[in-house]
Amino acid sequence: MPHSSPGAPLDPVAFIHSQIRTVPDWPQPGVQFRDITTLLQSPKALRILVDLFVERYVDAKLDYVAGLDARGFIIAPIVAYELSVGFVPIRKVGKLPYKTRSESYDLEYGSATVEIHEDACKPGDRVIIMDDLIATGGTMMAGRNLLQRLGAEVVEGAAIIDLPDLGGSTLLRNAGLTVYTVTEFSGH
């Protein structure tokens, strides 16, 4: 049973938040990078994090968990495994070997493209889409659009961290995507 192990924190969300390292001025001055590697290095924190997602989605009747390249690939397959559903990778352009569908999205300076195999899911499949964090929301929006173009029902967008000051979670919600994040950090 989730969180029943000895030494489990009384507030799992606060514990997860405390396990995320902030690296100032990386990758550029003024950015407060939220580093999940410290969370992942702790077996206790990783178990609690996975349990939080599993508890949320255990009764959602999902067919797949989709993960966004690259840090979404860390947690999404673990959650898919725990839920006994498939994992769908949504990759940066040119990384998938079979026939793909692609979706471009805007970045602060330029644009990027993600792809999905055209047979990754079928119409009516219920899917959540996961990443490590939501900043501007562009990558998750592109992933959602790809899944919907394949006919999937995108149940929710999920991430470990929300950076609400960057507006991504609001953008996604305004576009009709329900969003769940474990914790949030203010600022950039």
From Swiss-Prot:
Catalyzes a salvage reaction resulting in the formation of AMP, that is energically less costly than de novo synthesis. It is found in: Cytoplasm. Pfam families: Pribosyltran. One of its GO terms (cellular component) is cytosol. Keywords: Cytoplasm, Glycosyltransferase, Purine salvage, Transferase. One of its GO terms (molecular function) is adenine phosphoribosyltransferase activity. InterPro entries: Ade_phspho_trans, Adenine_PRTase, PRibTrfase_dom, PRTase-like. Disulfide bonds: none annotated. It comes from the Bacteria. It catalyses: AMP + diphosphate = 5-phospho-alpha-D-ribose 1-diphosphate + adenine. Pathway: Purine metabolism; AMP biosynthesis via salvage pathway; AMP from adenine: step 1/1. This is Adenine phosphoribosyltransferase. Its EC number is 2.4.2.7. SUPFAM superfamilies: PRTase-like (SSF53271).
